[in-house]
Amino acid sequence: MLDDEQVKAIWCARGGYGTVRIIDLLDFRKFAANPKWVIGYSDITVLHAHLNGRGVETLHAQMPLDIDKKTPETAKSLKELLFGNTYTIRYTDISHMLLFT
């Protein structure tokens, strides 16, 4: 799938521990010429970091396994992003979210 030009996104179904074991075995040369969205979190973070280090944007986002347990906005925002729509997130004060030790 990494090299398939017709594949536009790879949405990882669930986490696990396999990515860290195979990341050094993957050849990303063709992928770099035809990048695609890689979507997921957990174990997939290794793949995100690897691709981000090569200048490829990825989506650290909900996996399909649990998306039905989230709000409808979760699926909607992911779909909009994948189809090129953008939106702005506005906030007024995040000081209550900051933790200093």
Model-identified regions with their sequence ranges:
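Hydrophobic structural segments
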Residues: 1-3, 49-50, 59, 99
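Conserved anion/nucleotide-ligand pocket segment
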Residues: 56-101
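N-terminal small/polar loop signature for handling phosphorylated ligands or for N-terminal nucleophile
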Residues: 1-35
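Short, acidic/small-residue loops that bind anionic groups at enzyme active sites
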Residues: 26-51, 57-64
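Context-gated lysine
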Residues: 8, 30, 36, 69-70, ...
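Short, well-ordered, mixed-charge alpha-helical segments that flank or form enzyme active sites
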Residues: 18-21, 45-50, 66-70
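Charged/polar, solvent-exposed surface patches and flexible loops
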Residues: 24, 49, 76, 80
